[in-house]
Every structure is written in structure tokens, then in C-alpha cells.
């Protein structure tokens, strides 16, 4: 029987089982507590998370996976990579949060998606004039903190190549990888400090960048980087961790470098099986427990996979692992008391995945299986048999409808639709609008909570929602917005709201995961076939419409976003699930336009998230994702204007796909990126209309009228005003009313000033 290290967790959630970190951060930002309370709660969370893993028998437990905001931001702080505009902030806590969130006078650093997940990281801003230097306090302190509880952790670090590749240059023309000679000495110094901590220390370098299509030059830098780092100290055991796809090129590059191990994802990167003979005796951190989805592991399938791995890797060199950090899944099923018991039995959250690792280690490493161990396998397989036979999963009516789809696209070219829409809508040049949601006040959250818990009646709830809509419509009219929204007070989440009204979805009580900073989301769970039993948004939109003579947008979430922001069933192709959702959204659009709604927004905020990281897999995704969106809007008449919204995206590589989606208006997030994103549309000759977000809603900072006028003028240098809409860069639900009153008012004033100037020029 093998008795060595057998189990490994890439990283653990940090927001807290009851969102303790979120709550204390927001109290601190509201100046209702001191940093010492954050520090105390953070220490308690780290201790709890370490002990969970220790109790589950995990061999490799992490330190420095914890962060108060984001690990990429932590790494920038570690390297003293602080942009010049923050140089006057000397308090380290104030500096940290200013870089992430901005201040009244300073724009925050850019934020974007972490690969193809719904987690967002802060994008470091680098230049060759930066004085990089090491600040290792957090890393060293957390390692020592864990030792106080009897734990010798592996230390998690963002690897140099990933850090540089995901950073952006202050000078837009610079290649950030050219800065490797400047930051590598900081990493070397860090490793020397770590080597002094113990006679043997394990260090995990997260290098997910190598699962993308990287060029030969980057691979060479990757090789040189780890060749140098591996020679710092014989006390260190270096592990290069990859995840989200295969890393076959990197495995070959690392073949002759004396590192301890390589982490490979065998759930989303099965091609990794092809290069196991290149490990050369290194430990294989085998990612076999899905760190991105919430379904129970099929032990039989995983054991079969491990037997395949064992053909090329000695059993004693295999360590069973999660595919990636468990940051992407909720904490524990123990908090879920209202889930259907069958569906709950099919699930596994972070703490349950620890137990799955322990189970698989027993099944794989123990050669003479006892009755107890065999029972573990049998119980697991029984659950999968029951799921396969469950009537809760398949709806024959849905299957028949999908099989008989005849209409997949709407009528008319964009030019035909645009002409009809301009006549019907009669909007001014540079029309102003918002993305949809307005601030979710404590009062409105309490209203929803009380209704859900049967504390108030349906009439009381409806009255509260209508009062909010009344105020929201009145506010928008007062400041002069051109196209209004109802504010979405009835919606806790843009996906959950629709999931609650569609069949095939289930919801957790406490399934929160971190999206960015203190922002948490509670993804819906798709477990079965999807359909729409009845209209989902008609009543609230029609009520809002009755309160104004202006146009009110219908607000829907698109099928691809609903899919990508949900935990999707694992027994059906994602494309087939998306098609089912698209049919449900199509029915809703049809009902909305019949009710007189002239503009309908179908948000595809998460469209880019679903993109595979490897080019060879992209065409397949684009094909079914575009088809699903077009199927969803195929019921829209020519004169019905379809808007869509996309978040945090680099559009260079998907502009052709956006063209195929053919939305009449697309709103995008550009406020932290200047005109860089917009230029892509201009260069391409994009014909449809665009609403580039002109201010950053993720920061509490209120932009001035003059600043916004300048942004609009800059937009018009790239695209003609006839194609432009003026709007914030995202929904406003996370902001406070006091913030948005001024921001939106300034935005409208800026648009009106520019519009007036254009009209004067036109009549000269």
C-alpha cells in the first residue's frame, strides 16, 4: 500500500461560507469599521479553510491562495508594480483598495475575466520605468500563520509568465513579456526568503497562460524562467500548475527542468494524456476533480482515467487533485436544506470535493480494497444509476419541440431593420439609456426576502415593487434619459430571476461564489430539460410603460449568458441545453412585442466567457452560441429593436462573431480601456449601432460633465454619432443611489451638450 502524499487542492474559496469577507469589506468601505476587523475575520477564515482540508486528509494545502480582493492585484503589490497615479497614497491598505476600486479623484485599474470563468481579476499596469521590488510580507506571514496550526502549506504564487501575459503596458506598444528580466529577480529573492522558512517548502506557480495558444518565444521565456527558478534552492519543491485546458507544449518544455511536479487538467484538457511520457519522473498533480462545476464525480470514470494515466506515470508519482482552485464553486452542501433530495445527491461543492479526493485516493492507492472501500464505489455508482433513470431530467415535450424548429433567424437585413426602427422610435442623435438594473437598496432586498419567507403578502410585495418602479421611472424622466428601464427591483440576479421561471433549473440557498472583490454571485443550476411555463417579465414592463410616454426597454438575459453563468448539467452537450433556453427566450420576446414593447434588450454579458482557450475549439463554440442567440431573437419583428450587452471583453478576436449575432444595438464595457475596444469595431467596418460604456460603474467615483463630454468626443473620432448610444458600461445594481444620481445626470448633460453642438454644425 502506498502511504505517500496522495491528494492536492489547487486553492480554496475565501469569501466565507456566510460571505463574511464580503460583509466586512463593505462595512470598511462604508467607513463603518476599521481594518483590524477585516484582519481578524480574514485570519479566522484562513484557519477554518485550512482545518477543513486537514480534516479531510488533504496532503497539499495552500497558503497565499487567500486574498482580500484578488491574487493578481496581490502579485502587483508584491512586485511594487503600482501605477504612477496612485503614488500619492502612502497607507498600504488605502493603496490596495484604491488600485482595485478607484477613488473620487483616481480611476481604478482595469478589471477583466480570469480566462473563461466568471471570476474577474485586476489587470496590472506595467512599464519599463517601474522600480520593481519585492514585498513578501503577506506570503511569509500566511505561511507562518498556518504553521501555528500545525500545517506546512504549499505556497501559491501567480507565475511570472502568466502575470506578465495578463498585465497591460502603460505604453500601449510595449510587450509586457519584455519585463521578465526586471521582475524575475524579485521572484528569485522571494524564493530565497521562502527557502529560509523550513527545510522543505512546496511552491505552486499558477501558470494557466500556457493552456492558451502561446507562441514559441513565450515558451522559450517560460523555459528560461523556470530553469532559473528551479536552481534557487534545494530546499524548494516547485510545482507548475496549469488548468482550464491542456498544456502539452508546456509539459514538453519543462521536461528536463528539475521541478517537483506539474499540475494538469484532465477534465477540460484530456489531450494532456498524450504527453505524460515527457514528465521524466516528476510528480503529476492530476486534476481529476472538476473545480468549475458542482456535479458529483463519477468514481468509476475517474478510476478508468487514472488507469490510463498509470500506463505512463508510476502510481507513486501521481497525486490526485482538483482541476483548478475551488474558488469557482460554493462552499458546502450542508447549508442547502431546501434542495430536492435527489438533485442534491447529484451535487458536490468545495467541501464535498475534499471528501471526493479522499475517497478516490482510497480507491486508487489502496490495492487490497476492503468492504468499506468497495462500498464507497458502490454508493457513488448507485447515485449515477438513479440520476440516469430519473424523470426529473427529461421532458419529452421539450425534446419534440427542439426537433421541430423551423424558424431560426429574424427577418430583414440590418439596414432594413434600422430604417424601420428609426421611423418607429424617433430617437434623437446620441440617444441616452442605461444597461438595465438600478441600485438594489437594502429596502428592496428586504422586500424580496420578506416575500420569499412569507413575511408579507403578494399585495404588499407588488406595491413595494411598483413604488420602486415609480421612483425609478420618475428619476429617469427628471434627468432626461431618452430610453428608460424599469430598474429590475424584482430581480435578485439576472440569471437566477429567469431560472426561477423556467423549468429544469434549481436554486441554492447559500451557493455563493466570488465574482470580484466583495461581489458574489449565486449561480443557478441547470439539471434537466428547459422550458417556459408562462410569461416571465410582461407584468412589470407593462407597469413601467404605463408610467411614462417615453420608450421603456424590455430586459431579458440571453440564452448563452444563462448557460455560461449557470452550473450546467453534465449529461448533455452544452449546445443542446442552450438551444432549449433560446426557445424559452424567443417565446418571451414574442409576448413582449405583442404587448407593445418597442426595444428589447437580450443581455449576453457572458458570451465571451464560454469561449474555449484553444483556437482549434473556438469555431464549434461560436457556431452553436451564435445560432442560439439568433434563435432566441428570431421572433422579433423588423421594427422591434434588439439590443444586447457584453461585459469585460477583448473584442479583437470575436468581432466577426458579434457581426453574425446581428443585434441592432450592442452596448459594451470600454470605460477602463479607452477607445481601444471601440477601434476594433471601426476598423472592421461594423454596421450596427454601438453603446460604448462611457463611465465605470464598478468604481464609486462620479465623473464630471466635462470628462464625459471629452469621452463622447473621443468616441466620435472612431465612429460616427449616428451609430452611437450613450450609456454607462454596465448595470447599476451594485451602486448606491447617491452615486448614480450624479453620474447619470452628468452623462445626460454631456450627451445633450454634444448633441446641441452637432445640431448647430448641421444647420450652419
From Swiss-Prot:
Superkingdom, taxonomy of origin: Bacteria
Pathway annotation: Amino-acid biosynthesis; L-methionine biosynthesis via de novo pathway; L-methionine from L-homocysteine (MetE route): step 1/1
Where does this protein have coiled-coil stretches? Answer: none
Q: Where does L-methionine bind?
A: 435-437, 488, 603
* InterPro entries, A to Z: Cbl-indep_Met_Synth_N, Cobalamin-indep_Met_synthase, Met_Synth_C/arc, UROD/MetE-like_sf
* Annotated disulfide bonds: none
Q: Binding residues for L-homocysteine, per the UniProt record?
A: 435-437, 488, 603
Provide any one GO MF term from the record.
zinc ion binding
Keywords for the protein's UniProt record, in alphabetical order:
Amino-acid biosynthesis, Metal-binding, Methionine biosynthesis, Methyltransferase, Repeat, Transferase, Zinc
Binding sites annotated in the UniProt record for 5-methyltetrahydropteroyltri-L-glutamate: 19-22, 113, 519-520, 565, 609
Keyword Ribonucleoprotein among record annotations: no
A GO biological-process term: methionine biosynthetic process
Q: What class of enzyme is it?
A: transferase
Obligatory cofactor(s)? Zn(2+)
One family from Pfam that matches here is Meth_synt_1
Q: How is the cofactor bound?
A: Binds 1 zinc ion per subunit.
Under Enzyme Commission nomenclature, its number is 2.1.1.14
Q: Which reaction does this chain catalyze?
A: 5-methyltetrahydropteroyltri-L-glutamate + L-homocysteine = tetrahydropteroyltri-L-glutamate + L-methionine
Q: Which NCBIfam families match?
A: met_syn_B12ind (TIGR01371), PRK05222.1 (NF003556)
Functional description taken from the UniProt entry: Catalyzes the transfer of a methyl group from 5-methyltetrahydrofolate to homocysteine resulting in methionine formation.
Membership in a protein family: Belongs to the vitamin-B12 independent methionine synthase family.
Name it: 5-methyltetrahydropteroyltriglutamate--homocysteine methyltransferase
Please give the organism: Desulforamulus reducens (strain ATCC BAA-1160 / DSM 100696 / MI-1) (Desulfotomaculum reducens)
**Where is the organism placed in the taxonomic lineage, from the top?**
Bacteria, Bacillati, Bacillota, Clostridia, Eubacteriales
Amino acid at each position: 500500500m502506498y502511504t505517500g502524499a496522495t491528494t492536492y487542492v489547487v486553492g480554496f474559496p475565501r469569501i466565507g461560507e456566510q460571505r463574511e469577507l464580503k460583509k466586512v469589506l463593505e462595512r470598511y468601505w462604508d467607513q463603518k469599521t476599521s481594518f483590524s476587523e477585516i484582519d481578524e475575520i480574514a485570519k479566522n477564515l484562513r484557519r477554518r479553510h485550512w482545518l477543513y482540508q486537514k480534516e479531510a486528509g488533504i496532503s497539499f494545502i495552500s497558503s497565499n491562495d487567500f486574498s482580500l480582493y484578488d491574487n493578481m492585484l496581490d502579485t502587483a503589490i508584491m512586485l511594487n508594480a503600482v501605477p504612477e497615479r496612485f503614488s500619492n497614497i502612502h497607507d498600504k491598505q488605502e493603496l490596495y483598495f484604491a488600485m482595485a476600486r478607484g477613488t473620487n479623484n483616481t480611476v481604478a485599474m482595469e478589471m477583466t475575466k480570469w480566462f473563461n470563468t466568471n471570476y474577474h481579476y485586476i489587470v496590472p499596469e506595467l512599464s519599463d520605468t517601474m522600480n520593481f521590488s519585492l514585498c513578501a510580507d503577506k506570503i511569509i506571514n500566511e505561511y507562518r500563520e498556518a504553521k501555528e496550526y500545525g500545517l506546512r502549506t504549499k505556497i501559491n504564487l501567480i507565475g511570472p509568465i502568466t502575470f506578465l501575459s495578463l498585465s497591460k503596458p502603460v505604453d500601449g506598444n510595449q510587450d509586457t513579456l519584455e519585463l521578465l528580466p526586471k521582475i524575475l529577480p524579485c521572484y528569485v529573492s522571494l524564493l530565497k526568503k521562502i527557502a529560509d522558512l523550513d527545510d522543505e517548502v512546496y511552491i505552486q506557480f499558477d501558470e494557466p497562460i500556457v493552456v492558451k495558444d502561446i507562441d514559441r518565444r513565450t515558451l522559450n521565456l517560460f523555459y528560461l524562467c523556470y530553469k532559473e527558478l528551479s536552481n534557487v534552492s534545494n530546499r524548494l519543491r516547485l510545482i507548475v500548475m496549469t488548468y482550464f485546458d491542456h498544456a502539452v507544449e508546456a509539459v514538453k518544455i519543462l521536461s528536463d527542468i528539475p521541478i517537483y511536479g506539474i499540475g494538469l487538467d484532465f477534465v477540460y484538457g484530456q489531450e494532456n494524456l498524450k504527453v505524460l511520457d515527457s514528465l521524466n519522473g516528476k510528480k503529476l498533480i492530476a486534476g481529476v476533480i472538476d473545480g468549475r462545476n458542482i456535479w458529483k464525480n463519477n468514481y468509476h470514470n475517474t478510476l478508468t482515467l487514472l488507469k490510463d494515466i498509470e500506463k505512463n506515470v508510476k502510481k507513486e508519482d501521481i497525486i490526485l487533485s482538483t482541476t483548478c482552485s475551488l474558488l469557482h464553486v460554493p462552499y458546502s452542501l450542508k447549508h442547502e436544506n431546501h434542495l430536492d433530495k435527489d438533485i442534491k445527491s447529484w451535487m458536490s461543492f468545495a467541501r464535498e470535493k475534499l471528501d471526493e479526493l479522499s475517497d478516490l485516493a482510497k480507491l486508487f492507492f489502496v490495492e487490497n480494497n476492503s468492504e468499506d472501500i468497495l462500498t464507497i464505489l458502490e454508493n457513488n455508482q448507485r447515485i449515477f444509476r438513479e440520476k440516469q433513470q430519473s424523470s426529473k431530467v427529461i421532458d419529452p415535450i421539450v425534446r419534440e419541440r427542439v426537433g421541430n424548429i423551423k424558424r431560426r433567424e429574424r427577418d430583414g437585413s440590418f439596414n432594413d431593420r434600422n430604417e424601420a426602427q428609426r421611423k418607429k422610435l424617433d430617437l434623437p442623435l446620441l440617444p441616452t439609456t442605461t444597461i438595465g438594473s438600478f441600485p438594489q437598496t437594502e429596502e428592496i432586498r428586504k422586500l424580496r426576502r420578506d416575500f420569499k419567507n412569507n413575511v408579507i403578502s403578494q399585495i404588499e410585495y407588488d406595491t413595494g415593487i411598483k413604488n420602486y418602479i415609480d421612483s425609478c421611472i420618475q428619476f429617469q424622466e427628471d434627468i432626461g434619459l431618452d430610453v428608460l428601464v424599469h430598474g429590475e427591483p424584482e430581480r435578485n440576479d439576472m440569471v437566477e430571476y429567469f431560472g426561477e421561471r423556467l423549468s429544469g433549473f434549481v436554486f441554492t440557498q447559500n451557493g455563493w461564489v466570488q465574482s470580484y472583490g466583495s461581489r458574489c454571485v449565486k449561480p443557478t443550476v441547470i439539471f434537466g430539460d428547459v422550458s417556459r411555463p408562462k410569461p416571465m417579465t410582461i407584468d412589470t414592463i407593462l407597469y413601467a410603460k404605463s408610467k411614462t410616454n417615453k420608450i421603456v426597454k424590455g430586459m431579458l438575459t440571453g440564452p448563452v449568458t444563462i448557460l455560461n453563468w449557470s452550473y450546467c448539467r453534465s449529461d448533455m452537450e452544452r449546445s443542446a441545453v442552450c438551444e432549449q433556453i433560446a426557445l424559452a427566450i424567443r417565446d418571451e420576446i414574442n409576448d413582449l412585442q405583442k404587448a407593445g414593447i418597442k426595444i428589447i434588450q437580450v443581455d449576453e454579458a457572458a458570451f465571451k466567457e464560454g469561449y474555449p482557450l484553444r483556437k482549434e475549439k473556438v469555431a464549434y463554440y461560436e457556431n452553436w452560441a451564435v445560432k442560439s442567440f439568433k434563435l432566441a431573437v428570431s421572433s422579433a419583428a423588423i421594427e422591434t429593436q434588439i439590443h444586447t450587452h457584453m461585459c469585460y471583453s477583448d473584442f479583437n478576436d470575436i468581432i466577426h462573431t458579434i457581426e453574425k449575432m446581428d443585434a441592432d444595438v450592442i452596448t459594451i464595457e470600454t470605460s477602463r480601456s479607452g477607445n481601444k475596444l471601440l477601434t476594433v469595431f471601426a476598423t472592421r467596418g461594423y454596421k450596427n449601432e454601438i453603446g460604448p460604456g462611457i463611465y465605470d460603474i464598478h468604481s464609486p467615483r462620479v465623473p464630471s460633465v466635462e470628462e464625459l463630454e471629452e469621452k463622447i468626443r473621443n468616441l466620435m473620432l472612431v465612429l460616427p454619432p449616428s451609430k452611437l448610444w450613450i450609456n454607462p458600461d454596465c448595470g447599476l445594481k451594485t451602486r448606491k443611489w447617491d452615486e448614480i444620481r450624479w453620474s447619470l445626470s452628468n452623462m445626460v448633460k454631456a450627451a445633450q451638450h454634444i448633441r446641441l453642438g452637432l445640431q448647430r454644425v448641421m444647420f450652419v
